[in-house]
């Protein structure tokens, strides 16, 4: 029961996003609600929605703001959170995740969005989209709320692969700088390498080797290398791009999200303790709402797979409608900016002194 035929991503003058409706913990209802939320903020966006048509069809039909903007692609099977990536690589055809990535591969959509199993999504993305020339190990980049003027830092890798040698980390620096340059409109991003301390003698041998490579590539990569970073620098002003391996980055990301929720819970308990506290909460309601919005991890939901022949945004599996809308909003911004083409150009020119493509349509991230 597709509402209409989705436009081709290439040459149609419209932004088309491919969405896996079935992979999240909250089911397709949260995904469809997220699509609707993002659609209202992005009137030029259209969607190819992949999943069980019997489930998602009625949900989409009930939403007037999605009429004429969605095409449903029936996919009878679902990749679960317990499925192994190796199994999905061999037997994933027919799943909503596979179908979602296939739309990007076929040129029907510019960016894919999924709340599904991270390992499986990376595996499917790698075998269907393939890596960009010269990329050894793709990475997942996320936006981290920070004290910088733009409000965000970029951190990668946050979970694509637990391993990363010195050459991988140096390539992450190039990709992260390109993302910050085009996604955050930073002409010369500041890049740092996450370590257990800022002193030169600290850290594993591969980090010291990576530091030499990242520093040597700074001029060609059009970024400024600021040296080693500590965990406290992740939300700070010292850098714009934090480079690390996927294990460390994922632990840091989940710790940050848990801390944000803990602070929110503490504030709720403190202002609900007694009558005076509740009166104070009423007086400070506007400020509290602004604070809650700023530290709400749902509003910066969405990790970007870098280094592939296509753009994929990974939403948290537990994302609600707000989180899904944020991830789709990020996908729309990346599609509108032509980010994939610019990243490919940056990597292709990494051995030369070339620059990214002009930033003629790049918008800084905004919260949805």
Swiss-Prot record:
One of its GO terms (molecular function) is phosphate:acyl-[acyl carrier protein] acyltransferase activity. Its main location: cytoplasm. GO terms for cellular component: cytoplasm. Pathway: Lipid metabolism; phospholipid metabolism. Belongs to the PlsX family. Catalyzes the reversible formation of acyl-phosphate (acyl-PO(4)) from acyl-[acyl-carrier-protein] (acyl-ACP). This enzyme utilizes acyl-ACP as fatty acyl donor, but not acyl-CoA. This is Phosphate acyltransferase. It comes from Cereibacter sphaeroides (strain ATCC 17025 / ATH 2.4.3).
